[in-house]
């Protein structure tokens, strides 16, 4: 599941405009299914797949909550600069 977040910041005293775009996805499940017996075992689920809509919090593959899946954030920052007008 991917989410996209766009943040635009603009400073009044500056001539720089910064735009940031983040893609969030949830990859392999890290839930320890053997924690109650003192061991360590994961289920092998490689990627979170929402059961139901995109906003579902349960994985269709392993049945775990989304928080058990490792979160990856890819952020892209774009800065645009326009020099001050020399005629002012």
Swiss-Prot record:
Start and end residues, zinc fingers (ZF-HD dimerization-type):
26-72
Sorted alphabetically, the keyword list is:
Cytoplasm, Developmental protein, Metal-binding, Transcription, Transcription regulation, Zinc, Zinc-finger
Q: InterPro entries under this entry? A: ZF_HD_homeobox_Cys/His_dimer (IPR006456)
What name does this protein carry?
Answer: Mini zinc finger protein 3
Q: In which tissues is it expressed?
A: Mostly expressed in roots, stems and flowers, present in seedlings and leaves, and weakly observed in inflorescence and siliques.
Instruction: Assign the protein's first listed, main location to one coarse class.
Output: cytoplasm
Q: Which PANTHER family match?
A: MINI ZINC FINGER PROTEIN 3, ZINC-FINGER HOMEODOMAIN PROTEIN 2
């Amino acid at each position: 599941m991917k989410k996209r977040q766009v943040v635009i910041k603009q400073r009044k005293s500056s001539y720089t405009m910064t735009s940031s775009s983040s893609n969030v996805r949830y990859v392999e499940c890290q839930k320890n299914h053997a924690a109650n017996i003192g061991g360590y075992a994961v289920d092998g689920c490689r990627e979170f797949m929402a059961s139901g809509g995109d906003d579902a919090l349960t994985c269709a593959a392993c049945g775990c909550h989304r928080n058990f899946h490792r979160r990856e954030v890819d952020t892209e920052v774009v800065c645009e600069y326009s020099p001050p007008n020399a005629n002012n």
